[in-house]
Amino acid sequence: MFSFYFNDNKITKLLMVGYGSTGKSVCDFLANFIDITVDISQNDDEFVNYDLNSYDLITVSPGIPLNKSPYRALTKFKDKIVSDIDIFYQYIKDTKAKTIAVTGSNGKSTVVTMTDFVLKDLGYKSILVGNIGTPALNKIGEKFDYCVVEVSSFQINLFNCVRFDLGCIINVSPDHLDRYQNFEQYKQSKLNLAKFSNDFFVYDVHNGIKYAGEYQIIRGAIYRNSTKLLDIVETKLFGEHNLENIIVVLNILDRLGLDINQAIDSIKKFKGLEHRCKIIKKVNGTTYINDSKGTNVGATIAALNSITNSKNIILLLGGVAKGGDFSLMIKSLDKYVKYVYIYGVDKEYIESYIKGYCKYQLCNNMKQAFELASQKANSNEIVLLSPACASFDEFSGYAQRGEVFQNLVAQLEQKS
């Protein structure tokens, strides 16, 4: 039986606030490894009935808004709050496994997935956990050389005692402003990862903080000093943003002391992520691209800037805006977008930013937006789903939204 100690005190009583996949992983772990009493608060009404002073530790789901009532009360008990990652770290800290944490507004999922892929392709045992979808505690019991962790700003806010071997921040742009007072507060929450990392670097092309090590991008290729390492056409990816992602991965591998030339061969095999700038197919001369994972303004700007050099995109935009600043995409809309179909719960909010800067139409839902876009699109044009929004007003998540888009493309092809 594993005994969890915190500040040299054995933990016997814990309150769990929220019970999603992360909360369930904590419960399952505690039931199997630790002799401890656990109370679970699954909603606002239950939460107010618990005496927070009576618990040794409190775990909080990353989805719980600490800036809103009644959960503001938790901010008085920060010393008691630990995350599932903290508990995971306590379990593995005496092993030889290396932990790598990556955060950022855009690109972090690609970076952690590519890093995990390369490590495995090089023959190491690697696990991929965190915000990418698999709770870390679900991997307890597995043997591994490396643990690659995608972390969100919400998760970092809950960290207490974890120490990553390497932390990195990439591409911070405005997001989740419904949970933060302003962009500076959101950015600082990301930078706090440094407090929990033994080694740390930032690669942020949006804010002028670009640590690239010995690497640089020249005309669609990555160079190390004056030696060309990789051209984008040698990979299964496209766009300068993916060259930037590759540079981050190379810096991670450099700091781990691994062979970069072997890593380049592995990177060439990496196929990218589902729902991230994926060409679905061409129907009646129109190319359909699924970028459902573009859940904020910065992600959609990156997609627009990487897909074409012409003003031939018909864009599907909308969902839950999360307080995003859509004025930031006006330059890219003007340069690359022929028409925008806006849908979702925050369509009027989005309209208020782009009105007068591009041609657009408001739609009832994504299906209607797709149908209208398909009717308007001509040969050699692109219908792009890159919503710049969360999906929870209409879908269970970005993956379901992307699957629905792909199904609509398949149905259109059958009718053609």
Swiss-Prot record:
Compartments reported by the entry: Cytoplasm
UniProt pathway annotation: Cell wall biogenesis; peptidoglycan biosynthesis
GO molecular function, one term: ATP binding
Pfam families, per the entry: Mur_ligase_C, Mur_ligase_M
Binding site for ATP: 104-110
Coiled-coil intervals: none
Domain of life assignment: Bacteria
Disulfide pattern: none
Entry keyword annotation includes Signal: no
Keyword Ligase (UniProt): yes
EC number(s) given by UniProt: 6.3.2.9
Assigned keywords, A-Z: ATP-binding, Cell cycle, Cell division, Cell shape, Cell wall biogenesis/degradation, Cytoplasm, Ligase, Nucleotide-binding, Peptidoglycan synthesis
Catalytic activity from the UniProt record: UDP-N-acetyl-alpha-D-muramoyl-L-alanine + D-glutamate + ATP = UDP-N-acetyl-alpha-D-muramoyl-L-alanyl-D-glutamate + ADP + phosphate + H(+)
GO cellular component terms attached to this protein's record: cytoplasm
Stored InterPro entries: Mur-like_cat_sf (IPR036565), Mur_ligase_C (IPR004101), Mur_ligase_C_dom_sf (IPR036615), Mur_ligase_cen (IPR013221), MurD (IPR005762)
Major localisation: cytoplasm
GO biological process: cell division; cell wall organization; peptidoglycan biosynthetic process; regulation of cell shape
Job of this protein: Cell wall formation. Catalyzes the addition of glutamate to the nucleotide precursor UDP-N-acetylmuramoyl-L-alanine (UMA).
Family annotation (PANTHER family): UDP-N-ACETYLMURAMOYLALANINE--D-GLUTAMATE LIGASE
Protein family: Belongs to the MurCDEF family.
Name of the protein in question: UDP-N-acetylmuramoylalanine--D-glutamate ligase
